Amino acid sequence: MSVRLRMRQALPAAMRARDKAAVSALRAALAALDNAEAVPVDEAELRGLALEQSPVGVGVTEAARRELSERGVVDVVRAEAAVRLDVAAQLTAPAHADRATQLRAEAAVLLRFLDGPGTA
């Protein structure tokens, strides 16, 4: 089973369990995966169209998407975990201890998905 699918399946369970770290990490990682699949839009094609020339119909507003390989998914999730660990390491002031702990917990959630079956 793919990393993305396991993450999508884990999100509702984390929400039911009220696991804030898991919910936050999974939502952010899934959004990062969606963003990584986005294809740049050529705004020159859309700019300056009169209302009558605007695209109309089912699916015309859908954006093209790239297909990430499983390796690409793993790389994005690993990068999301690394960002959290880097930020947590920078939060050294006692006032930020709770936030650093939260970020480390989120990184641990993401790294668990990379250690499971079907990661590469």
Which residues fall in each region the model found?
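Charged, compositionally biased, marginally structured helical/coil segments
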Residues: M1-A120
